[in-house]
């Protein structure tokens, strides 16, 4: 997502779905594959995006250098100093999105750990959403629990259809 700027959209799906090609970044992420599978089961991308708005808690794509010298995705919550520095930007971004008229009765938080904890904390302070439902992160599912992918897909679909 840091490469494309589109939530959970890798370069492969972006090109296949929209025709937009990002040179030198034609990669496929299992997180994106998982969410596309959920969307397909939901009724397809058009049905999904007709019913849901998807975006990041943090609007910035952040990368860091790994031990091999390669740029890798970095989540805003991996570094507490970074998280605090970005908090005003995050709050402004969330408010701007809400000001566009999105339904704030339910927020599905992709990431049931630190992302959910941070979003819940700022929601307690700012009352952005009536309810926040945590869903396991697709990377966690695909990297550590791929044998239970169907169980997690069903969890996503039940939450989204409730």
Q: Where in the sequence are the language-model features?
A:
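Short helix-capping segments at alpha-helix termini
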Residues: 123-128
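Phosphate-binding/catalytic loops
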Residues: 129-143, 147
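Charged phosphate-binding loop/patch that engages nucleotide di/tri-phosphates or the phosphate backbone
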Residues: 162
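A polyanion-binding, active-site-adjacent surface
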Residues: 1-106, 116-120, 133, 143, ...
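Short beta-strand scaffold positions
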Residues: 109-110
């Amino acid at each position: 997502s840091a490469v494309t700027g589109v939530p959970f959209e890798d370069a492969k799906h972006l090109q296949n779905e929209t025709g937009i090609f990002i040179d030198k970044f034609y990669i496929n992420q299992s997180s994106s594959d998982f969410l596309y599978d959920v969307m397909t089961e939901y009724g397809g991308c058009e049905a999904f995006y007709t019913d849901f708005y998807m975006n990041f808690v943090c609007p910035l794509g952040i990368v860091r250098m790994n031990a091999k010298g390669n740029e890798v995705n970095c989540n805003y919550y991996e570094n507490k100093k970074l998280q605090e520095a970005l908090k005003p930007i995050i709050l402004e971004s969330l408010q701007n999105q809400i000001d566009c008229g999105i339904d704030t009765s339910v927020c599905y938080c992709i990431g049931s750990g630190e992302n959910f904890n941070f979003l819940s904390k700022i929601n307690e302070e700012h009352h952005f959403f009536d309810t926040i439902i945590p869903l396991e992160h697709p990377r966690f599912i695909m990297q550590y629990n791929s044998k239970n992918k169907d169980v997690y897909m069903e969890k996503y679909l039940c939450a989204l259809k409730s």
